[in-house]
A protein has these predicted regions:
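N-terminal helical cap/lid subdomain that shapes the substrate entry/recognition surface
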Residues: 2-84
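Non-catalytic pre-domain segments flanking phosphatase-related domains
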Residues: 1-5, 193, 200-201
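Conserved H-loop
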Residues: 32, 54, 117-121, 186
Length: 202
């Protein structure tokens, strides 16, 4: 079985850095600043609408912020218990993967920082913002394995529901516990230990 993680907001605490970068360049790139902390109940699509960004602008903006994020990737830390969770799952015989919009370089810097590089055998970086459904479907075909996905956003839940992949949501990322629980009842973990125990029970 593969345990596949989202990166931003699930493995890596990028919320503050990401929010800062997005708002820092708002005037230059022509969109409205967003108070991300006050809008954790909003989906990515709702936040895009609030910012005034047009959907055709999204690919270019993502490329821009991937580059900026790589420049500061060394600042990114793992959430509490995540390195230990990854090691414990690997030791139990689970295969590990990552599917994310984040750049391969940022992921590599992060995994090297925590000595986790060799534990992940499937990494699909730089997918489009709303391309997770397709990426998960392709992973199932390629890996020929059962998958459990670990993510922090509503769009993770939507992608997994569309591909019939079970998901464990985590409460420490982009979306609030309340909105995750509403959309993925009984499967929202508040700690890395809860993620581990939920996987083992499955």
């Amino acid at each position: 079985m593969y345990i596949i993680f989202d990166f931003d907001g699930t493995l890596a605490d990028t919320f503050a850095l990401g929010s800062q970068l997005i708002n820092e360049y708002a005037d230059q790139l022509g969109y409205k600043q967003i108070d991300f902390a006050a809008n954790k109940d909003k989906s990515a699509r709702e936040l895009i609408k609030m910012s005034g960004v047009r959907f055709w602008q999204i690919p270019g903006l993502i490329r821009f912020f991937r580059k900026k994020s790589v420049e500061r990737a060394a600042e990114v830390n793992a959430f509490d218990g995540i390195p230990d969770l990854v090691c414990r799952l690997h030791d139990r015989g689970f295969h590990l993967g990552i599917i994310t919009t984040t750049s391969a370089q940022t992921i590599s810097i992060f995994l090297q920082k925590y000595g986790l590089t060799d534990l992940f055998t499937y990494i699909k970086p730089e997918i489009s913002l709303f391309g997770k459904k397709r990426a998960i479907r392709r992973a199932r075909r390629h890996l020929k394995s059962e998958i459990i996905y670990i993510g922090d956003e509503l769009r993770d839940i939507e992608a997994c529901r569309a591909t019939d992949v079970p998901i464990i949501s985590v409460s420490w990322g982009f979306n609030s516990t309340e909105i995750l629980e509403k959309n993925n009842p009984g499967l929202v973990a508040a700690s890395a230990e809860e993620v581990y125990n939920t996987i083992i029970r499955k």
